[in-house]
Amino acid sequence: MSFDLAFWHQKSVPTVEEAAQIYDQLVDGLSGVVEANSAVEDFHKAMISVFPDLAEENMDESPWTSPLYVTSECVIATISWSRSGEVPSVLLDLASRHGLTTYDPQEQAVYGITGEASTR
């Protein structure tokens, strides 16, 4: 079992409905959904320095159930449920430090750069 978190740069924190639309488009592989931003690449580098991307060599200890989905616009992580107590808080902190919005589609929650959630 796993769950997703999505990260992107946006000047203002979107509503849950807006974030859900953005997430759906990003998951569908559309580009131009949000502006590309170097903060996304910087976040990705910081993220894989803590939790390396899934590879054959680290499958047993990786928190990811599939390789990270990374573009110039977003990072989408599919996290193993067994690591749900540890990984999200680290990623939320990193995202906040890089000025990124985080969307949790399971909880329908949006986290802005303050790390505070807004939900339906």
Task: Spell out what each predicted region is.
Residues 1-120:
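Acidic (Asp/Glu-rich) sequence patches and key acidic residues
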